């Protein structure tokens, strides 16, 4: 089942199917056939693919030579929680069109970090409820979720190993 949110982000793209190595369809699996039995298990059982939020929906193409230039349609709303909901809609549409069963994320991949930890927690509560609904509707499961205790400059000297105990305490609260 393909899960589409308030808008379709990947218009014209249906569920990605296995078509074999001779297919010229760029949106088809050439070698991965989820139903093929290999060593007593289906390929789907052997290859438990997970879509990583950070790499798939958050990266904007930045590198040491300059900022990112990729702009995504789910990253347009001015309200950070709405932007996070749009990203979740795009994510679950993508995951279900790919036919994958799992996703993974860092906390601030789901929703932008706020100026304060308390406000970040409020945002996380809102998006967590929304994502849980998406999981239930799609059957997509969480492979892992964790705290990003490295991107914020406050963690420049580490999180749990930071010499400033205020930073250690913040990391503990974030986790």
Question: Over which residues does each language-model region extend?
Answer:
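N-terminal pre-domain/capping segments
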Residues: 1-174
């Amino acid at each position: 089942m393909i899960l589409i949110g308030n808008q379709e982000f990947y218009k014209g793209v249906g569920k990605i199917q296995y078509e074999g190595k001779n297919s010229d369809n760029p949106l088809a699996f050439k070698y991965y056939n989820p139903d093929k039995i290999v060593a007593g298990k289906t390929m789907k059982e052997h290859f438990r693919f997970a879509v990583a939020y950070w790499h798939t929906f958050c990266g904007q193409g930045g590198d040491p030579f300059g900022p990112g230039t990729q702009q995504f349609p789910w990253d347009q709303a001015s309200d950070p929680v709405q932007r996070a909901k749009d990203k979740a809609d795009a994510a679950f549409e993508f995951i279900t069109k790919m036919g994958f069963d799992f996703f993974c994320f860092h906390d601030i991949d789901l929703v932008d970090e706020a100026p304060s930890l308390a406000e970040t927690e409020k945002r996380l509560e809102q998006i967590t409820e929304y994502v849980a609904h998406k999981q239930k509707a799609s059957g997509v499961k969480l492979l892992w979720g964790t705290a990003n205790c490295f991107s914020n400059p406050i963690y420049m000297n580490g999180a749990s190993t930071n010499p400033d105990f205020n930073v250690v305490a913040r990391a503990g609260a974030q986790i």
